């Protein structure tokens, strides 16, 4: 009995079919070795199979250290897209309430690197909201609106990767730190466990 395998598109030739199957097997092998959520898995499959990104273009669970005065804290990006040596898009995988993560994602993109990462996406694996992290404005909605690798290369050539002005840097770090402080604990606390 044969099994249906989603190749992302209908192959136009036996050679293309072989290439798509090879790409799918490579992606499955890559994803199977990562400690990721089901949403991250769906996003990675989409990026690799539908948008043409390679493993080298994708950083998963990437940690960044942020210094805020005397406080140092770590923040993590669920998925980062990096093309031609530049991080240009950060993806936040959220279970629900995508719009509640917009401000966090914008602050994240503005302060975690030596330059402002220009775009942020918040997704639950089905829906997505893409933001211009420089202005904070919503650009598009829908997973399909994430740029392809080819389009990303064009974006990277056209965008000015400049740092956030110093007078705004501390404010964005404080916003990021506030979101970091309200994370839910991994285990229940304060509950009577008898």
Where are these regions (language model features)?
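Short beta-alpha junction loops
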Residues: 123-128
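A short, conserved, highly charged catalytic patch centered on acidic carboxylates
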Residues: 2-118, 129, 134-194
């Amino acid at each position: 009995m044969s099994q249906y395998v989603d190749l992302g598109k209908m192959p136009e030739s036996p050679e293309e079919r072989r290439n798509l199957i090879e790409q799918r097997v490579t992606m499955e092998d890559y994803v199977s070795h990562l400690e990721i959520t089901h949403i991250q898995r769906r996003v990675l499959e989409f990026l690799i199979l539908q948008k043409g990104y390679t493993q080298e273009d994708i950083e998963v669970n990437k940690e960044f250290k942020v210094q805020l005065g005397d406080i140092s804290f770590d923040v993590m990006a669920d998925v980062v897209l990096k093309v031609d040596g530049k991080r240009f898009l950060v993806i936040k995988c959220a279970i629900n309430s995508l719009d509640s993560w917009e401000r966090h994602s914008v602050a994240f993109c503005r302060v975690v690197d030596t330059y402002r990462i220009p775009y942020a996406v918040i997704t639950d694996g089905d829906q997505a909201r893409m933001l211009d992290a420089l202005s904070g404005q919503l650009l598009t909605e829908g997973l399909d609106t994430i740029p392809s690798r080819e389009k990303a290369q064009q974006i990277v050539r056209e965008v000015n990767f400049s740092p956030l002005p110093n007078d705004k840097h501390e404010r964005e770090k404080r916003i990021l730190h506030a979101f970091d402080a309200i994370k839910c604990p991994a285990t229940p606390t304060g509950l009577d466990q008898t």
